[in-house]
Amino acid sequence: MIASKFGIGQQVRHSLLGYLGVVVDIDPVYSLSEPSPDELAVNDELRAAPWYHVVMEDDNGLPVHTYLAEAQLSSELQDERPEQPSMDELAQTIRKQRQAPRLRN
């Protein structure tokens, strides 16, 4: 069984770039189409670990969907960041929906 380090709705940081993001989905292993070696230089162990769909903001403040390995992320300890309120709002909305899901027809 593969355990993920981060949860849906959790705020995380890109370990190398420092960008703040919110986890919106988790894949237990790398699940996108098979990349060429030039596109993704990762080993098999990294591909077998959890991968995360993370929404981050670009330099213009626009949301960007990213697909990152668990090793590329670190925990974000603060609950609120005044410099990026949209990431706080997104995380809060996702957590609320997970606590009280709406029924769909």
From Swiss-Prot:
Entry's localization field: Cytoplasm
Predominant location: cytoplasm
Entries under Pfam families matching the protein: YccV-like
Ranges where the record places region Disordered: 74-105
Keyword Cytoplasm: yes
SUPFAM superfamilies named in the record: YccV-like
This protein's UniProt keywords: Cytoplasm, Stress response
Molecular-function GO terms, alphabetical: DNA binding
GO BP terms: response to heat
The keyword Cytoplasm appears for this protein: yes
Biased composition annotated in UniProt, kind: Basic residues: 95-105
Database matches in InterPro entries: Hemimethylated_DNA-bd_dom, Hemimethylated_DNA-bd_sf, HspQ
One Gene Ontology CC term in the entry: cytoplasm
Family, similarity comment: Belongs to the HspQ family.
Primary role: Involved in the degradation of certain denaturated proteins, including DnaA, during heat shock stress.
Stored NCBIfam families: PRK14129.1, yccV
HAMAP family: HspQ (MF_01194)
Protein name: Heat shock protein HspQ
